[in-house]
């Protein structure tokens, strides 16, 4: 899907035309620069690689520097590929938030907040084990049994247990576009998006 890179600024709320108070997320979108154009003949598929947020040359590796010099653009901090652009772009072209002006709804891809190692109650919504009386004292938030007896004599794959929670790629689909502010490179979408303030997002049309 065609889209742009952006940065999560934070959340606020706005009033709709009907007077409803809508929670929304403010995203800084672009400007993104075209750093590579992939073609069917050369790469086996068609896509446009976009860069977001310039960085200094001293923070750029030599292979990266060669890539950016070939495109004739300044070093970019974040890169991402998008497919199915209707417009043909050239290396060095700049795409701004105006690109999303006619999009009524967008999909947002980000990395969720990391929660560290969490138990089954927080991670999977378990209710805990039975009563907390009659001598029970240390199993209120335990997972309980994880398998059968001598048969099948193993724990099945996918058994829900405690473990690392969050810090994974999450896609939220069909978020309504509340407002596009080209003068500030800002996009307001209804609801929340994954990640902490300042995290990088992919906004897909």
Curated annotation (Swiss-Prot):
InterPro entries: Ribosomal_uL3, Ribosomal_uL3_bac/org-type, Ribosomal_uL3_CS, Transl_B-barrel_sf. GO terms for molecular function: rRNA binding; structural constituent of ribosome. The keyword Ribosomal protein applies. Keywords: Ribonucleoprotein, Ribosomal protein, RNA-binding, rRNA-binding. GO terms for cellular component: cytosolic large ribosomal subunit. One of its GO terms (biological process) is translation. It holds the Pfam family Ribosomal_L3. One of the primary rRNA binding proteins, it binds directly near the 3'-end of the 23S rRNA, where it nucleates assembly of the 50S subunit. Belongs to the universal ribosomal protein uL3 family. PANTHER family: 50S RIBOSOMAL PROTEIN L3, LARGE RIBOSOMAL SUBUNIT PROTEIN UL3C. Part of the 50S ribosomal subunit. Forms a cluster with proteins L14 and L19. This is Large ribosomal subunit protein uL3. It comes from Parabacteroides distasonis (strain ATCC 8503 / DSM 20701 / CIP 104284 / JCM 5825 / NCTC 11152). The gene is rplC.
